[in-house]
Regions:
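N-terminal secretory signal peptides
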Residues: 1-35
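N-terminal export signals
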Residues: 24, 33-59
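N-terminal cap/lid segment of alpha/beta-hydrolase-fold proteins
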Residues: 65-100
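Short beta-strand element of the alpha/beta-hydrolase
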Residues: 103-112
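Cap/lid segment of the alpha/beta-hydrolase catalytic domain
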Residues: 140-163, 271-276
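Gly/Ser-rich "nucleophile elbow"/oxyanion-hole loop immediately N-terminal to the catalytic nucleophile
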Residues: 150-189, 301-304
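Primarily recognizes the serine-hydrolase "nucleophile elbow" in alpha/beta-hydrolase
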Residues: 171-228
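Short beta-strand/loop motif that positions the catalytic acidic residue
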Residues: 233-235
């Protein structure tokens, strides 16, 4: 049965809503594996065991390649960089259009709570196809990088100093701004944990020219006044955990006169952009991504802040 689950691409509609909530709590460390299995067993249907449900909800990175590494439109490489206020020696995945002449804007891509997965690398390649230079650091660099297994990646990232991780991504903005391929105008996009970090970059990096957090934790209300970058904020309509922080964030944005757009995708779960799991919502992912590309084109190619 588990082999069949692995081969068949399921969607969120194939699972009881309570199972999806349990899975969200599991991947964010609120319950352990045993807690998920015990909870999911109450909703197991169609001959699927709780273990099979967990397997079915876990990423299948064979589905992540919208832009293959071999795509002749792009060029990629791993970059080393120093993060003196963060974790020290770091690595990141760099993607740009092939045969690039001149300079173009950049986007820092910030991963979820498990390191630099194949999905996040593919997001960087999608940005390169859209004519940006993209840089996706791996917060797990000090531990050897993303281990090839999401559960292990989550465990590894949980052991790291979260403040230092944020410093690593702040430094990544500086690195990308100074790249010879980049105009110096840089935005950020992040997912889940990366959405939270994207919000923090908006607070802490005055030169950030645009920020697009996906279903990320919100900054403290008292920090919102520090935001300079325009924001495009994406939420899944069913993501009760993250969405609970939005009213206070929105009130602070309005009170401080900040420029923002916020979109809630009805019927979409947390993680709806990640096309490697059943929580993926194709319509919401494609619409939100087109909006994000349009947002970056508007704010990074005209006006805004440049450092070079």
């Amino acid at each position: 049965m588990e082999q069949q689950v692995e081969q068949q691409r399921l969607t969120a509609k194939d699972f009881h809503p309570e199972i999806l909530k349990l899975f969200d709590r599991y991947v964010h460390g609120m319950i352990d594996r045993r807690g998920f299995l015990d909870g999911a067993a109450k909703f197991a249907v169609g001959g699927m065991t709780a273990a099979a449900i967990l397997q079915a909800l876990s990423p299948n990175y064979a589905w992540a390649e919208q832009v293959p590494e071999s795509d002749k439109r792009i060029a990629t490489m791993m970059l080393d960089y120093d993060s003196p206020k963060g974790q020290g020696k770091m690595k990141g995945y760099f993607a740009k259009p092939a045969n690039l002449n001149g300079k173009i804007p950049g986007v820092v891509v910030i991963h979820e709570n498990r390191g630099l997965t194949p999905y996040i690398k593919d997001v960087a390649r999608r940005l390169a196809v859209a004519n940006f230079v993209a840089f996706a650091p791996d917060a797990l660099t000090p531990l050897g990088g993303y281990p090839g297994n999401d559960d292990k990646g989550v465990e590894m990232q949980r052991t790291l100093d979260q403040n230092k991780i944020i410093e690593d991504f702040i430094e990544a903005v500086n690195v990308l701004q100074k790249r010879p391929e980049c105009t110096g105008k840089v935005g950020a996009v992040g997912f889940c944990f990366g959405g939270s970090v994207t919000n923090q970059l908006a607070v802490r990096v005055p030169s950030l020219a645009a920020a697009a957090p996906y279903y990320g934790g919100q900054p403290k209300a008292e920090d919102v006044a520090k935001i300079n970058a325009p924001l495009m904020i994406h939420y899944g309509g069913l993501d009760e955990r993250v969405n609970a922080g939005w009213p206070a964030y929105e009130a602070a944005l309005k009170a401080n006169g900040k420029k923002y757009e916020e979109y809630v995708y009805a019927g979409a779960n947390h993680g709806f952009h990640n096309d490697t799991t059943p929580r993926y919502d194709k319509a919401a992912a494609e619409l939100s991504w087109q909006r994000t590309i349009d947002f970056f084109n508007k704010n990074l190619r005209t006006g805004g802040r440049a450092t070079n």
